[in-house]
Amino acid sequence: YYNMRGIDITEKCADFDVFFENASCPKISIGDGGNEIGMGNVELNLSSLKIKPSTTECDELLVADVSNWGAHGLIAMLSTLQNKDYLAAWENDKTLHMLSELGAVDGVSGKRTQTEDGFTSKETKIVINNLRKLSGFR
């Protein structure tokens, strides 16, 4: 496994590819740096970049500037389809704090900060609020 900067992080990661590849349900992946499970769908498109992309494929690939933001977008779509504001209760600060306490690092800086690919929680909250507006909930 490699992070988005091409650094080998295999010893710090669990091998989920085998579960993903053997799952019988539809597989949705969200990626932003090319190294995420599912980015194998666009491996040829990534070959000219100076990264080591994931080769694992998925059924549906959602590419976003920040993977977490792509997940929020997917949740916003589900909110619209089910007419329920699933993002209303999302507590980004608490989530980032918990992840940092457990040893997670920012994907861009590689440091244990309460940020997402270099973006502050405040910036993520703006994205979430905009998604909620687009979904008709703000």
Ranges and model annotations:
Residues 14-47:
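Catalytic cores of nucleophile-dependent amide-cleaving enzymes
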Residues 34-138:
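C-terminal functional extensions of proteins
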